[in-house]
Design a protein with these regions (language model features):
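Glycine/Thr-rich phosphate-binding loops that ligate phosphate moieties of nucleotide
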Residues: 1-31, 66-104, 135, 252-257, ...
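Gly/Ser/Thr-rich active-site cleft segment
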Residues: 9-11, 109-224, 318
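N-terminal phosphate-binding loop and adjacent alpha-helix
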Residues: 26-61
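Phosphate/pyrophosphate-binding loops at sites that engage ATP/ADP/AMP, CoA/4′-phosphopantetheine
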Residues: 49-63, 132-137, 185-195, 363-375
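Short glycine-rich phosphate-binding loop at a beta-alpha junction
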Residues: 61-69, 118, 142, 216-218, ...
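Short acidic, glycine/serine/threonine-rich loops at helix termini
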Residues: 76-79, 154-158, 163, 212-213, ...
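Active-site phosphate/pyrophosphate- and oxyanion-stabilizing loops and adjacent acidic/basic residues
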Residues: 127, 148, 264, 287, ...
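ATP-dependent carbohydrate kinase catalytic cores
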Residues: 171-273, 310, 343, 388, ...
Length: 459
């Protein structure tokens, strides 16, 4: 029985799964935490990865492994492969002005890369490095992403020329063309200030980036692309993830080029594209409201379902931490439309859910405006199991919603990719994440989405 391992190295933790490469049967799993912060020494990731590998009994009986990770993080190495400074993660916003400068210098950057730059992108962080730590920028001889660096460390190589990546993670750098699968040297040169730097080679998803006959490491991927593969998303699917923040992405055969910067034109893991939009406020809003009302999450769901669609006219814009889609970092939350008649806990609970779902729907609506066609909706993430969230999502989107069972989709996607390379099949394995729950659309389509879209645009 060939075995594969898949790793999800996220901002919060590292998780590993071991699966039968042919059937997908889960054989083992482990996880370890990562330190908090937006600036982290990559040595912590490496230590945690070594820990979970030890927890599953090592890699001696593992035929192949794939590593997926948080996107955008800047890991800068010197000529000897040593880390020059702590990695700046995707959620480090000190590079916002650097992003604006590069967007101004390359007015067609969204046509070149599929995305306008924001602070999260690697190119923005590289420019920040040049502007604020010129001595470190001058020493840079390799720029890698978190998953690239971990794959390279796992290989045991000491040469920066051996670092490899895949197109999905590279597409989040801001200096990569996902159509030709090649780096754009002019953007990187403008960001860093010199061209004496090595970038990871791009490896196909069904090939190994490292194979010494004993240890085989697949190309790896960015976390969203790996999650899409892990959950079984296919062309035309819209995936909505409701964690602390919210993410909407679709599988498309055409790259998007959004001049507004609200939609990132990423690549997926298989050769298609992954237009993606984020909202900063999702399940954290539900936590805040349950704490305010002094109720459990289950009680919050029941309370929201007691209210009529539209929450009696209450509009809840849940921008507690600013917002990314639309890009309003200084936005604040607002509740309006309150009257003596509608001001009750049930309407507040429902308005909170409607506000979060409408925020995600606004992000997804940008896909349609860019020509991305979607049909099936997959609802994933911690809040996806909530009955009120499920029902309200069907009403806001006006169609059935599919809810996969809980799982480690990012790690599973990395394991699938490793199995794909190991088994040398034309397509990735078909083993899936289990039976999806279908939440049917009731036919009740309140006008709340229009109200929220108008309020969002007026911010």
């Amino acid at each position: 029985m060939p075995k594969v391992a898949g790793v999800d190295s996220s901002t919060q933790s590292v998780k590993i799964v071991v699966r039968d490469a042919q059937t997908g049967e889960l054989l083992n799993s482990a996880s370890r935490p990562h330190p908090d912060g937006t600036e982290v020494d990559p040595a912590h990731w490496w230590s945690a990865l070594q820990g979970v590998i030890e927890d599953i009994g090592g890699l001696d009986d593992i035929d192949a492994i794939g590593i997926a990770g948080q996107q955008h993080g800047m890991v800068v190495l010197d000529e000897g492969g040593d880390v020059i400074r702590p990695a700046l993660l995707w959620n480090d916003t000190r590079s916002s002005q650097a992003a604006a400068s590069l967007n101004s210098e390359f007015e067609n950057i969204h046509q070149l890369t599929g995305s306008k730059l924001v602070a999260a992108f690697t190119a923005s962080k590289v420019r920040w490095l040049k502007d604020n730590e010129p001595e470190n920028a001058a020493r840079a001889r390799a720029i890698t992403l978190p998953h690239d660096w971990l794959s390279w460390k796992l290989s045991g190589s000491n040469s920066i020329k051996d670092i490899f990546t895949d197109r999905s993670d590279a597409s989040g750098t801001g200096y990569f063309d996902s159509n030709s699968n090649s780096y754009i040297d002019e953007i990187l040169m403008a960001a860093l200030g010199h061209n004496q730097v090595h970038l990871p080679r791009i490896v196909a998803p069904n090939e190994f980036g490292f194979d010494n006959g004993k240890l085989r490491i697949s190309a790896g991927a960015g976390d969203n692309a790996s999650g899409a593969l892990g959950v079984g998303a296919t062309l035309g699917d819209l995936v909505i993830s409701l964690g602390t923040s919210g993410t909407a992405f679709a599988i498309s055969d055409k790259q998007t080029h959004d001049v507004s910067g609200e939609v990132a034109g990423f690549a997926d893991l298989t050769g298609n594209f992954l237009p993606l939009a984020c909202t900063l406020n999702a399940a954290k809003v539900f936590d805040a409201v349950t704490n305010l009302l002094g109720i459990s999450f289950d009680e919050f769901s029941k309370l929201a379902l007691d209210a009529d669609p539209g929450a009696g006219g209450i509009t809840f814009l849940p921008h507690f931490d600013g917002e990314r889609t639309p890009n309003k970092p200084d936005a604040q939350g607002n509740i309006f439309g309150l009257t003596h008649k509608n001001f009750n806990s049930a309407n507040i609970a429902r308005a909170a859910i409607e506000g979060v779902i409408c925020g995600i729907a606004y992000a997804a609506d940008q896909f349609e405006q860019l020509g991305v066609k979607t049909n099936r909706i997959l609802l994933i993430g911690g809040a996806a199991r909530n009955p009120a969230v499920q029902q309200i999502a069907t009403e806001i989107f006006g169609k059935d919603v599919q809810v996969p069972p809980p799982g480690e989709y990012v790690a599973d996607g990395a394991a699938k990719q490793a199995a794909w390379a190991l088994l040398k099949t034309t397509n990735p394995p078909l083993w899936g994440s289990g039976e999806f729950e279908k939440v049917p659309f009731s036919g009740n389509k309140p006008k709340v989405k229009t109200r929220y879209f108008d309020a969002i645009r007026a911010m």
